[in-house]
């Protein structure tokens, strides 16, 4: 009806046993078809200084393949990733070396890590790969103690934050221009 592309994720997908799932992200085309899907590789197993312990691997299995890059007709080449992956720059270099001009990073960053790391990591991934970063982000309080950072963002290939949804529910919307990616990659040929 609306003829839009939609990113779903991360969401749980059965992993074939009774106790684990995969954390999946999928890009859907205008007609609802799945254009690409990715199961998160890097799991969030950390003990944070705020006293919260996270062991994602207790319920989630790591994906076995690097994320895809899909050429979306009428838009650009899009690479997928999920949340904690953002801390592993080699994954994003893989995406850019496979042509990604826009990188999706849906996330549920904790408020504790997000306040110091979220925006900086997103800007670093945009700059070092001269690609747009679109980062949908969960916000709010969950399960009593867990608080998500929020701040869904769109960042351009120069590292400029084009849109930030803040901590409230909402949307981060900004135009993405393939020609800007091309121009910055010519001016700053760090991918060669």
Mark where each language-model region is.
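Short, highly charged low-complexity linear segments
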Residues: 137, 191-192
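CN hydrolase (nitrilase-like) catalytic-core segments centered on the catalytic cysteine
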Residues: 1-8, 77, 83-172
């Amino acid at each position: 009806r609306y003829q839009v592309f939609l990113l779903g994720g991360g969401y749980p997908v059965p992993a074939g046993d009774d106790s684990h799932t995969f954390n999946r992200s999928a890009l859907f085309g205008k007609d609802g078809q799945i254009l690409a899907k990715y199961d998160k590789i890097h799991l969030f197993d950390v003990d944070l200084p705020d006293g919260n312990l996270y062991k994602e691997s207790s319920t989630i299995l790591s994906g076995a393949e690097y994320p895809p890059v899909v050429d979306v007709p009428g838009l650009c080449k899009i690479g997928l990733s999920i949340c904690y992956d953002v801390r592993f720059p080699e994954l994003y270099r893989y995406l850019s070396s496979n042509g990604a001009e826009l990188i999706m990073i849906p996330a549920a960053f904790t408020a504790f890590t997000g306040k110091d790391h979220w925006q900086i990591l997103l800007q670093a991934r945009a700059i070092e790969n001269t690609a747009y970063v679109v980062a949908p982000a969960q916000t709010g309080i969950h399960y009593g103690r867990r608080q998500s950072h929020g701040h869904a963002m769109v960042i351009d290939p120069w590292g400029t934050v084009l849109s930030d949804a803040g901590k409230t529910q909402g949307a981060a919307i900004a135009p993405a221009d393939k020609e800007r990616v091309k121009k910055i990659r010519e001016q700053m040929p760090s991918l060669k």
